[in-house]
Amino acid sequence: MAVSTRVATKQEVPESRRAFRNLFNCFYALGMQAPDGSRPTTSSTWQRIYACFSVVMYVWQLLLVPTFFVISYRYMGGMEITQVLTSAQVAIDAVILPAKIVALAWNLPLLRRAEHHLAALDARCREQEEFQLILDAVRFCNYLVWFYQICYAIYSSSTFVCAFLLGQPPYALYLPGLDWQRSQMQFCIQAWIEFLIMNWTCLHQASDDVYAVIYLYVVRIQVQLLARRVEKLGTDDSGQVEIYPDERRQEEHCAELQRCIVDHQTMLQLLDCISPVISRTIFVQFLITAAIMGTTMINIFIFANTNTKIASIIYLLAVTLQTAPCCYQATSLMLDNERLALAIFQCQWLGQSARFRKMLLYYLHRAQQPITLTAMKLFPINLATYFSIAKFSFSLYTLIKGMNLGERFNRTN
């Protein structure tokens, strides 16, 4: 007896929205949004407490942290050039981070609305292979959140360790009432405070950077599932080709094709929910990535000592995580959409009714329209844009290196 791959029980149907569980737990910890079922959503008292917590977190990250970085440069007279550059490469990110936080927090309802479209697409899954693909995606996305958090925490920890080895605070932030040069005790207090500030900032940064990668990956999975269903058009439940089906089977094939067209429209609506959010946050990141990478490479190859080089290299890898994975997923989404159009050609359309072929032509026309994501309608979000930014930052480093600033600075000192 052939083993059927159909699953009839509703309880076994996976949910793509579970891929965002760890992500929204991070948003919850940052005071951005309380998930359904949490205490702030079930108790008015906890709702007020969480609202106060959110205000404190927003004031801290949007106002105080950038202010600490900016004011610190008024007191940079006693700082070494490596310390200035280490602080500057992070300060660029910290000062621009509020724009990303505001853009993301303002558009969180759009991301939540996307879950309704995902639920409609998940309901179309019928085979165990489809369920397994969704479960693997859920597992990967939740692990990816931890991967980002760990990578950013490694940078923060490495900078903290290097600070103690060099006897200087990690970023020499302006902290009222503290002068790290006055005593060893004040140095230790300042270093620990900066470490905590940077860890919290990294939590924000990692959450703001990973969400786009996760959402685009989930959309890619839905496109791949749709392509699998389209390829099976014109076949029976066992996968056997029906070249000249009877009238009843032709109607069933037409109905399945209609459902695939509706799935494609739902997928486009899903993209309409998430693309404006990604557009705004990645635009901000594109604007500063070249400056950050250029500053970091100048620090690594010209001024930094061995300990600072290690921390700066880790930071450069973290900066790569801010844009490269999102650009990769956007490029892969375009390729998956092209494979969807090819899947239409591979379905069993020969011998089908005229109505089926007309609908298939309409579907082919819609599917051949490319899915292109843009950053504020100015820059395409793809790997070509990322490599252009990387080339520009390397050109900036080459220009600075050609000016022999390192030798001039050493002669001056």
UniProtKB/Swiss-Prot annotation:
The atypical heteromeric and topological design of the odorant receptors appears to be an insect-specific solution for odor recognition, making the OR/Orco complex an attractive target for the development of highly selective insect repellents to disrupt olfactory-mediated host-seeking behaviors of insect disease vectors. Odor-evoked OR currents are independent of known G-protein-coupled second messenger pathways. Glycans are attached at residue 410. GO terms for biological process: calcium ion transmembrane transport; detection of chemical stimulus involved in sensory perception of smell. Expressed in olfactory sensory neurons in the antenna. It holds the Pfam family 7tm_6. Interacts with Orco. Complexes exist early in the endomembrane system in olfactory sensory neurons (OSNs), coupling these complexes to the conserved ciliary trafficking pathway. It comes from the Eukaryota. Residues 72-89, 166-186, 303-309, 391-413 are extracellular. Belongs to the insect chemoreceptor superfamily. Heteromeric odorant receptor channel (TC 1.A.69) family. Or2a subfamily. The chain crosses the membrane at residues 51-71, 90-110, 145-165, 187-207, 282-302, 310-330, 370-390. One of its GO terms (cellular component) is plasma membrane. GO terms for molecular function: ionotropic olfactory receptor activity; ligand-gated calcium channel activity; odorant binding; olfactory receptor activity. Residues 1-50, 111-144, 208-281, 331-369 are cytoplasmic. Keywords: Cell membrane, Glycoprotein, Membrane, Olfaction, Receptor, Sensory transduction, Transducer, Transmembrane, Transmembrane helix. This is Odorant receptor 7a. It is found in: Cell membrane. It is a multi-pass membrane protein. Odorant receptor which mediates acceptance or avoidance behavior, depending on its substrates. The odorant receptor repertoire encodes a large collection of odor stimuli that vary widely in identity, intensity, and duration. May form a complex with Orco to form odorant-sensing units, providing sensitive and prolonged odorant signaling and calcium permeability. Highly sensitive to the sex pheromone of the silkworm moth, bombykol. Intriguingly, the fruit fly detectors are more sensitive than the receptors of the silkworm moth, although its ecological significance is unknown.
